[in-house]
């Protein structure tokens, strides 16, 4: 009997159906000599600090750095039952072999190995490596199972990454939270991402726009621009000179240019385009893609490759033929598919690019939600564009001389629409416009030496523009490329985060209060600014990730030592704790919430603030305080709210509805007066207005 362990229930169910394991049990399928179960993602994780020592439940500087010598693991909360199922299955006497069917790559390896180790399993295991949930792909994968132990170095790389993130995250988060009296989540990926947001927002807010002028010359249907002019008088002089002169085309340059078809989608590219066109967040795009994958309509979405392998060419061309028949906007397009640009075995590691499946050709869009339809259309259109001919055009640059000045006119003429035709048709069919698309400017026929009488000139006043705020589209791109120049070419991961985790990083920054969404823009908050300012560069720069990936790639290849890597991480963590042992009192107040005065003290004129139990005067020498549990309000069964306190401070009275009368047992409306006599306690009284 073989036990197959998938990463998710949906994947397990799909594999079970193909293998003929059709008998549903509690937490697994059985049949045809197979048991098929699943992990529910990260079933086992590194234990938290308190597992090692109960005193770590309280965050204290003296306990830092926390460096486990004997690492411990724990079952994820709420997933205990499924781990128990897997453990029992692993130890069944009739199970002779285990198949690791978790996602291919570093994290999938980690997920399986953690379960295998936690269950104390010693049985041999093999590795399933597939990129599609289609039946043919699953069958082929099982006919080519690999030796599980050949991935030991990959597992060590994954384990080192997990431990290093734990050490930096736990210690840096506790260190800076203790120093600044606020929970400050610090992470190797999250913090540099926040810093990029802060740097961009600061560049925008500190940008000083500068005015400049441009003279536009209109001659014989040609519109040509001058260079930038900082002086308005110079622009006026140019305009006057041109209107008295004849214009001449002094040079004409024509150049044929080609724009190659786009590559296929990896997850980051899909997220970027979905955000730009539809406003989908990165998390939404992954959720929609995952749902399509589980419906067998889309290949594995968490890929970082934009290529297919050579053995996929024939099946991919069949997909293209089917899409041309399925998609209405392709009916009049003659497409001769060429996949050579996106076929590269060396650039497909864990999984190939995101593609529609053959199952989608049968099912179509009929059962899909609107969001899934949009995403599926993007993937289909990208495949068709990638297989189409290049876009070819003629670029024309003309120099026009007039009044002693030179102007430039640029235009282009399409020679072959190629893949751009498909992109335009796809956009039109979905009624979406690409805001970044540039309009095509066509120049009239021109020749060198051609003259133009009575040219017209006009002055345009313009301003330099600040950088644009990050959107999820542009931030994902920045994360993908951060630190790339320092990362080895063959590293499994480049940039900040992975194709699968970047969305979670953005969401975490928002939920922690360090960033916020304003429309499509991502903006850092005040706390985000402060956090980026207080942390050392080693935590705010993508350099750390680049260095780690260099080492982790070496570990995965067997050329670097896991022990040496972990020793360097421990030394870095200890150095952080030692360097940041104390801060000034002013810095410690950076994350203190800004207090908002609710009114003015009737005794001394100082500001009155709301506390947990009272409303108090900010002048410590003044004894004015109104208690929220004042018996006056409790007897009348009314909460002493901030709004009531503010009204009393402003007007000395407030109208309150539904107060309870202890004499009549009924409610009444009345005006409450602030009857302060300057004593230890503030008094209140009612001018009743009974119903």
Model-derived segments and spans:
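Amphipathic alpha-helical transducer elements in NTP-driven molecular machines
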Residues: 9-16, 33-36, 40, 76-87, ...
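Metal- or metallocofactor-binding catalytic centers and their adjacent structured scaffolds
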Residues: 232-265, 271
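Basic, low-complexity terminal or inter-domain segments flanking catalytic cores
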Residues: 2-3, 79, 90, 173, ...
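C-terminal or mid-to-C-terminal helical accessory/interaction module adjacent to the motor/catalytic core
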Residues: 137-217, 254-255
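Conserved short loop/turn motifs at secondary-structure junctions
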Residues: 1-3, 101-104, 181-183, 254-263, ...
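Intrinsically disordered, low-complexity regulatory segments
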Residues: 1-162, 166, 465-466
């Amino acid at each position: 009997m073989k036990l197959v362990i998938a990463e998710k229930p949906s994947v397990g169910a799909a594999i079970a159906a193909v293998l003929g394991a059709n008998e549903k049990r509690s937490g697994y399928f059985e049949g045809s000599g197979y048991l098929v179960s699943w992990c529910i993602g990260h079933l086992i994780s590194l234990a938290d600090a308190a597992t090692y020592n109960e005193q770590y439940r309280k965050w204290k500087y003296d306990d830092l750095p926390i460096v486990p010598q004997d690492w411990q693991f724990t079952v994820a909360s709420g997933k205990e039952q499924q781990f128990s199922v897997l453990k029992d299955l692993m130890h069944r006497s009739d199970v002779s072999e285990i198949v690791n069917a978790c996602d291919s790559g570093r994290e999938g390896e980690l997920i399986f190995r953690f379960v295998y180790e936690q269950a104390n399993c010693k049985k041999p295991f093999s590795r399933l490596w597939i990129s599609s949930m289609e039946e043919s792909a699953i069958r082929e994968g099982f006919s080519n199972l690999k030796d599980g132990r050949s991935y030991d170095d990959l597992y060590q790389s994954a384990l080192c990454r997990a431990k290093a993130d734990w050490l930096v995250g736990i210690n840096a988060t506790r260190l800076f939270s203790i120093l600044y009296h606020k929970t400050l989540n610090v992470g190797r990926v999250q913090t540099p991402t926040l810093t990029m947001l802060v740097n961009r927002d600061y560049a925008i807010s500190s940008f000083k726009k500068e005015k400049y002028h441009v003279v536009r010359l209109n001659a014989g249907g040609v519109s040509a621009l001058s260079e930038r002019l900082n002086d308005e008088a110079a622009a006026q002089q140019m305009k006057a000179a041109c209107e008295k002169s004849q214009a001449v085309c002094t040079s004409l340059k024509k150049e044929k240019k080609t724009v190659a078809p786009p590559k296929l989608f990896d997850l980051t590219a899909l997220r970027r385009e979905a955000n730009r066109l539809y406003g989908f967040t990165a998390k939404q795009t992954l959720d929609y893609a995952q749902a399509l994958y589980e419906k067998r309509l889309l290949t594995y979405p968490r890929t970082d490759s934009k290529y297919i392998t050579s053995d996929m060419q024939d099946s991919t061309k069949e997909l293209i033929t089917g899409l041309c028949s399925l998609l209405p906007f392709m009916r009049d397009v003659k497409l001769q598919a060429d996949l050579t640009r996106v076929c590269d075995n060396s650039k497909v590691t864990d999984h190939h690019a995101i593609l529609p499946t053959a199952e989608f050709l049968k099912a179509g869009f009929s059962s899909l939600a609107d969001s899934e339809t949009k995403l599926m259309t993007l993937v289909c259109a990208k495949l068709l564009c990638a297989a189409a001919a290049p876009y070819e055009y003629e670029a024309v640059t003309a120099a026009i001389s007039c009044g002693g000045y030179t102007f430039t006119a640029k235009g282009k003429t399409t020679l072959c629409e190629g893949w751009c035709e498909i992109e335009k048709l796809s956009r039109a069919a979905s009624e979406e416009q690409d805001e970044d698309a540039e309009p095509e400017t066509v120049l009239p026929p021109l020749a060198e030496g051609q003259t133009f009488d009575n040219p017209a000139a006009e002055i345009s006043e313009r301003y330099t523009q600040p950088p644009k705020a990050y959107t999820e589209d542009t931030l994902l791109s920045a994360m993908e490329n951060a630190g790339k120049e320092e990362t080895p070419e063959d590293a499994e991961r480049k940039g900040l985060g992975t194709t699968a985790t970047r969305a979670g990083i953005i969401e975490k920054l928002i939920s922690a209060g360090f960033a916020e969404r304003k429309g499509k823009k991502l903006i850092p908050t005040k706390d985000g600014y402060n956090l980026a300012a207080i942390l050392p560069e080693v935590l705010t720069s993508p350099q750390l990730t680049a260095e780690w990936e260099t080492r982790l790639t070496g570990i995965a290849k067997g050329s670097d030592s896991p022990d040496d890597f972990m020793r360097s991480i421990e030394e870095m963590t200890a150095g952080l704790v030692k360097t940041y042992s104390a801060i000034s009192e002013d810095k410690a107040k950076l994350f203190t919430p800004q207090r908002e005065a609710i009114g003015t003290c009737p005794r001394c004129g100082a500001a009155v603030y709301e506390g947990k139990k009272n409303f108090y005067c900010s002048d410590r020498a003044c004894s004015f305080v109104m208690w929220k549990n004042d018996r006056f309000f409790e007897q009348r069964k009314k909460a002493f709210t901030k709004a009531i306190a503010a009204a009393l401070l402003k007007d000395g009275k407030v109208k309150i509805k539904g107060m309870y009368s202890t004499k009549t047992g009924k409610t009444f409306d009345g005006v409450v007066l602030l009857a302060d006599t300057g004593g230890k306690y503030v008094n209140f009284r009612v001018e009743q207005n009974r119903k």
